[in-house]
């Protein structure tokens, strides 16, 4: 299973400010830092997300078709997380709402470096 995902950034301080505030919404915070890399998680034994200035010295670019999905436990949390991302300067890529008939509820946005993220939950069916 996935341990963590890393996204590139060209401005680590700006990315840290964005993710510090955003990931607080789901109980995650910084747990590992170096000069070029910062990792976030709810706990060191839980999946996480990292941001990094590329080690090859080239500019960070967005992966075409790449997306990071963060799971929460309710549509309300999807809505809150999405609104927080937009308030922090993220770009809308799909407003919160149900997708299909499976109970999948999601929202999509791009962070300040253009990386695409999704926040989702599975609604309980009655």
Predicted regions and their residues:
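Short glycine-enriched loop/turn motifs at secondary-structure junctions
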Residues: 1, 61-64, 101
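N-terminal beta-strand motif that seeds the catalytic metal site of vicinal oxygen chelate
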Residues: 1-16, 68, 123-126
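Conserved beta-strand segments that form the floor/walls of ligand-binding pockets within enzyme
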Residues: 4-6, 50, 67, 108, ...
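Core segments of cupin and vicinal oxygen chelate
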Residues: 7-48
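Conserved active-site tyrosine of GNAT-family acetyltransferases
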Residues: 15-19, 85, 114
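Vicinal oxygen chelate
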Residues: 26, 86-126
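Long, continuous compositionally biased terminal/linker segments
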Residues: 41-80
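Mid-chain, well-packed structural core segment of small domains
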Residues: 67-99
